[in-house]
């Protein structure tokens, strides 16, 4: 199915952007509004997909049902069940059974790992495993990479105005892989953890280097979002939503630039501030605010010691 459009237009275009009209992603449902008037509403679908790594069943996830190969690969990567140097020799998808099997060149056995299952705060009941943090402190994010505040305006406009299932039906989260001011690949799902995994899978399958990328999400900045972004080795995480304190602690521990409440030229950064180049300027949006207030609108820096999470 044509779940997304591949675009080769100009430097501001997506490489791949959502196709909200793809078959099977939503259905039309009749109902009434608050006045009793008849309405017909597009509603997103939910499908169970069971992921296998070689011969072992790992998890069943409720998902939108698109890009399931990317979803499976990204999930296994973010759960430390696949390594970046692992060789995938095949991916099988049985749409009727709702099964995806990822086959690797070497044998795998995660029976012990699966006993340490943790339910996350992600929509659609995300699942993590107790040793998900085992590689976290070993990952070194590139400190030389800069994030220009001016890029955020272009990114936000391109992302928020692009066709998407969120705009047509709602009840969905989106994640976008970006480079500087340009959005590259967009993925959506009913759970933000699924959307993240789809991006991780796409990067692995397309051998995309992460060091100079930006990760944009519509969801909350939680520990799961921070952990997965760090494991993907992307140095900047941006959201139009807010933070949890534990996510901020983890971002600082990893040296991740964490930016939330992003809207237009306004944002709040709580970690990795040294990467930010404040080049957006003082335009009409901030013209009526004193200089110190303008600085606060764009940046909040918490100087209190952070807590360690183990």
Residue ranges with predicted function:
Residues 10-174, 178-179, 184-186:
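Intrinsically disordered, low-complexity regions enriched in acidic/Ser/Thr/Pro/Gln residues
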Residues 173, 193, 301:
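Histidine-centered active-site/metal-ligand motif
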Residues 271-299:
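C-terminal domain-closing interface element
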Residues 1-8:
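Short, Lys/Arg-enriched N-terminal segments with co-localized hydrophobic residues
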Residues 66, 191-192:
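A short acidic/small-residue loop/turn micro-motif
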Residues 300-310:
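Single conserved hydrophobic/aromatic residue that forms the stacking wall/gate
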Residues 192-281:
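Feature captures the catalytic cores and cofactor-binding loops of soluble hydro-lyases/lyases
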């Amino acid at each position: 199915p044509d779940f997304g459009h591949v675009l080769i237009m100009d430097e501001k275009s997506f490489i791949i952007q959502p196709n909200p009209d793809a078959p099977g992603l939503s259905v039309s449902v009749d109902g009434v509004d608050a006045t009793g008037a008849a309405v017909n509403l597009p509603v997103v679908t939910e499908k169970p997909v069971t992921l296998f790594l070689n011969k072992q069943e790992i998890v069943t996830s409720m998902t939108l049902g698109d890009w399931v190969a990317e979803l499976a690969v990204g999930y296994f990567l973010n759960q430390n069940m696949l390594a970046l140097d692992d060789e995938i020799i095949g991916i099988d998808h049985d749409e009727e059974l709702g099964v995806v099997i990822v086959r690797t060149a070497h044998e795998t056995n995660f029976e012990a790992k699966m006993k340490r299952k943790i339910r996350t705060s992600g929509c659609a009941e995300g699942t993590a495993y107790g040793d998900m943090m085992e590689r976290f402190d070993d990952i070194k994010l590139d400190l030389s990479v800069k994030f220009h505040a001016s890029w955020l305006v272009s990114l936000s406009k391109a992302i928020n105005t692009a066709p998407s299932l969120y705009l047509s039906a709602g009840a969905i989260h989106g994640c976008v892989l970006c480079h500087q001011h340009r959005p590259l690949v967009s993925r959506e799902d009913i759970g933000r953890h699924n959307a993240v995994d789809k991006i991780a899978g796409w990067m692995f399958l397309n051998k995309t280097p992460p060091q100079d990328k930006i990760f944009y999400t519509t969801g909350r900045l939680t520990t799961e979002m921070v952990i997965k972004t760090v494991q993907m080795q992307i140095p900047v995480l941006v959201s139009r939503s807010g933070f949890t304190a534990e996510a901020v602690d983890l971002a600082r521990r990893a040296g991740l630039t964490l930016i939330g409440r992003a809207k237009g030229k306004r944002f709040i950064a709580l970690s990795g501030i040294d990467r930010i180049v404040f080049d957006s300027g003082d335009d009409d949006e901030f013209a009526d605010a004193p200089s110190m207030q303008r600085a606060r609108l764009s940046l909040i820096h918490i100087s209190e010691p952070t807590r360690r999470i183990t």
